[in-house]
Amino acid sequence: MAAERGAGQQQSQEMMEVDRRVESEESGDEEGKKQNSGMVADLSAHSLKDGEERGDEDPEEGQELPVDMETISLDRDAEDVDLNHYRIGKIEGFEVLKKVKTLCLRQNLIKCIENLEGLQSLRELDLYDNQIRRIENLDALTELEVLDISFNLLRNIEGIDKLTRLKKLFLVNNKINKIENISSLHQLQMLELGSNRIRAIENIDTLTNLESLFLGKNKITKLQNLDALTNLTVLSMQSNRLTKIEGLQSLVNLRELYLSHNGIEVIEGLDNNNKLTMLDIASNRIKKIENVSHLTELQEFWMNDNLLDCWSDLDELKGARSLETVYLERNPLQRDPQYRRKIMLALPSVRQIDATFVRF
């Protein structure tokens, strides 16, 4: 069922996923950039990729007619059931699937989550791209580890507090305005909430096993309430309303940080994030590379579409011996006819400048 859409998803500089599915409202060349680097983050194959095409349109206005479930043959002994794009309008008749572990119902016409109580062995449930307005009737699925209800019409996070074995939760591109009702999900490792209407990071302090958090393309104004997430390795906050890098001091295991398309003016607040290998601060209002000389494990540094105009700032990156990819295009620096040559001289380990590989 392609449960791993994640971290690397298209939440790139667009986003998101990731990620793995994560997320893509930016320009096409930005997407290409992510793919070239092999770090299609944050936003997930689900994040943002179809968002602009679909927008907030109510799928009920579509012209597809639901299919009769009696015309669909189900294998009683199947462990993996994929009914992607079958025009299913109602969940029914699945009680015969006593052994099913993964059930994919993406891209159908489902309006209500129902009639799944008998699927006690279910580990993964995919309801991506339907017409669901409410999370309900899932309490009996206590073995569930992966739940995807992205690209639906949800306004609230609810009805999942009993799913205590859940490890991955994807609710991308809905109409959710608040993070809530997930405090019991102690085993959660990946949370994907890109492309919603969330205004604050809150109610996640009990998610101490969380490794990846995708919140790209929301309305968040401040990095906060992250102190308990000491196992977090990926944080994606592209396309929000941030003006300051802060609140990351406890994220000592953070390896990938995506902050593009915000209103940040200064690089700061990264003193304890020594393990960072990926830093994306593209499309902000930053004039200077500073406070990153201690990030010696950096492999990728994306700072295109900012206000950088001083070549000596690149000295801040010289300690990153493994730095292979830098994006500095569409900064004032790029006007220099020796732009690429000067980057190569300042950062000899770099193998890719913007979207082009270095030729030796």
Swiss-Prot record:
Residues 1-65 are annotated as: Disordered. The keyword Nucleus applies. Residues 17-34 have a biased composition (Basic and acidic residues). Gene3D superfamilies: Ribonuclease Inhibitor (3.80.10.10). Keywords: Acetylation, Leucine-rich repeat, Nucleus, Phosphoprotein, Repeat. The modification N-acetylalanine is found at residue 2. The keyword Isomerase does not apply. Residues 331-360 form the LRRCT domain. Transmembrane segments: none annotated. Interacts with PPP1CA, PPP1CB and PPP1CC/PPP1G. Interacts with PPP1CC isoform 2 in motile caudal epididymal spermatozoa. PANTHER family: PROTEIN PHOSPHATASE 1 REGULATORY SUBUNIT 7, PROTEIN PHOSPHATASE 1 REGULATORY SUBUNIT SDS22-RELATED. Regulatory subunit of protein phosphatase 1. Inactivates the PPP1CC isoform 2 during epididymal sperm maturation. This is Protein phosphatase 1 regulatory subunit 7. The gene is PPP1R7.
